[in-house]
């Protein structure tokens, strides 16, 4: 289907932290007393170069939410009475949820693209976008129906604005603006990786800042020190492939059923293998930092499969001989042991760095899709215990991409007064906004800077934390 021009996003900044809300190329400015500046810049797209400029409404603190255009102003509810709709479409899951301000989950709906993943051997952005567009209306409506609410009952809408796949992000953003415009609701733009970190605060009410976070998924490996809401230090990241990508590719090469997800399929197969059968090398041991690399380990897996003459492309594991199945299980178990050992070594160094910066840290938060892996949790729990920290992992349903984490992060920032006013009633559907597909969460720790040539830096937006710091300096 033809892709319509949908909103892209670029977050403004407040004095307390960056408001990842909707703006376009406007210089960030701090609040002045209780009256915020005009931080939202929008323009109407047109074939004409002389398109009229529409002045935006001001970003306002929570206590002074006002309406745009013909929408009706709403009084600020107490936190427990907040009702946040969260929408997530950053990659291959279409998700929506409604969460109350005190953390009660009223509904959670996820539509998976597992069949597409199996058919195309991974995420095909255009196919994923079309799949999102086909189900987004039903997913959001079911989230409202399951919560026994209508759009008019909501306090605000939170939506993932980055990082992620641009084609996919725009579907969720467009739907969020539709809902917000229809019911006069404020919008909170959410950083996908921050949402993975903060959902643990919904699960564990004792979890407070500062804490160490490990966010592991198909596209991300990220070690961060969370100082406070919106203030993060990046201790380490992946310089090529993330651990989830390595799990998925290895599972595919081993001929596993990808409909249940590559990670879970490989984890299950590894239970039947010898983790020491194949002598895979642990990546990056010569680099004394906290960065990750899984591209080389993927290559080792591929070579191991070829060396054993396993016909994994033609023979799925369900049709393989007993000897063949055992060889595949041994490769899976050996891969998992080394992949997680790489995690352990980097996390141990990150704990040491984090405690040097913030000696008061008590929690080690692990989230993201790979955090659902029981072997990963067991090994990282040992790291936490060895360093006197408490491991906090959300339940598996909140580790993978979901609407709950988006809604909860939206609540945290909405309460802090960081949101955009409802879209104007006359806002056209073909407006264009800047999305943030490459959006760092925090500033890099000086000791963690990598000199690896493959470190991805091109077309990266300024980090959320750098925007906060810039606003405070002004």
Positions of predicted regions on the chain:
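Acidic, glycine-enriched active-site microenvironments
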Residues: 2-474
